[in-house]
Structure formats: structure tokens, C-alpha cells
Amino acid sequence: MVLEQYFLLLPEFNLNTIRVSNNPSGSAAKPLFMYNRDGSICYYKSTKQVDFVRTFGIHKVTFMKHLEQGTYYLNKYLFSMEELPNAEQSDMTVEQVATMLDIDRVTNNKNKTLVSFSVAVTLINIETKEEHKFPSLGTAVKFLKNGSYPADQRTLVKRINTNIPYHGFTCHKY
């Protein structure tokens, strides 16, 4: 306690000397860019991450993941800290880019499974070699039940990639 009082009362000691990394004001920040998948069009650039988060509704964790790993956001957009020399600046407004992202989110989310741990499977008929692809085990079980088979999801899980027949089908992840 005495040490705290000493530092608080000492006039030349400054407690506000913390340097903020990635300064949110953008004064010392590196520029960030949003390109199309092949990097030929630059849709947006800013020195602040918060602009991408607030303006376009991209979650900060999602933004950082795609920025750091170099993966494509919505399988279409590339975030980068480097300016690509051959990229042309888009003439779209910020509102148009935000609308484009909203439309792509709806389209992309329709193609996703509802549960992140869902397993996409293929059932292959042993006799005809006909393949039936399903986005989840549940839909594969419904298919088997509609074919008058007493199907069970637990048993189907055990048969994935084992080549053990289940009601005339083999089950594989895809």
C-alpha cells in the first residue's frame, strides 16, 4: 500500500504510459484491404479493423481468422494487410458492398448445414453402385426409413467408412 501511495503522489511519475498495440484510432495501424477471390478487384480498404466489423457486420473473430489464415470469407472475399499491385479499385459505394455481402451471406448460409458438427454422407447401393449424397446423417436415415428400412442413426454412424453393408448400402463421408 505504501508503494502505491508513493507512485500516486510522485509528481514526475506518469501512470498513463501504456502503449496500445493496434491503436484503434488507426494512427499507426497498417491498412486492411478486401479483395475478390482472385485479388483483381479491391472492394474496400481501411486502416481500422472496426470499420470492417461495424460497416459490414463481420464478426471480429471471423474477420481476424480470415485475415491471419488467408482464407476466403464466404468463399468469395480475401482480406489482406498488403496492397495487391494489379488490383483495380471498385467503384462500388460502401453501402453497395455491404448489400453485396448481405446477399452473399444469405446464399452461403443456405448451402451450410444447420449444425456445425453435422456429417455429410454418401450412401452407395451395393448392387447397383448408385450413390445418394446427403448433407447430414439425419437425412440419410430418413431416406432409408422412406425405403421401408428400420434405420437407426447410431448404427449408421458406426458404419461410416467401414464398407460394412447397412440395409444394402455402404456409408461414406464426403
Curated annotation (Swiss-Prot):
Its EC number is 3.1.-.-. One of its GO terms (molecular function) is endonuclease activity. The keyword Translocase does not apply. It is found in: Mitochondrion. The keyword Mitochondrion applies. GO terms for biological process: intron homing. It is an enzyme of class 3 (hydrolase). GO terms for cellular component: mitochondrion. Encoded within intron 3 of COX1. To endonucleases of group I introns of fungi and phage. Mitochondrial DNA endonuclease involved in intron homing. This is Probable intron-encoded DNA endonuclease aI3. It comes from Mycosarcoma maydis.
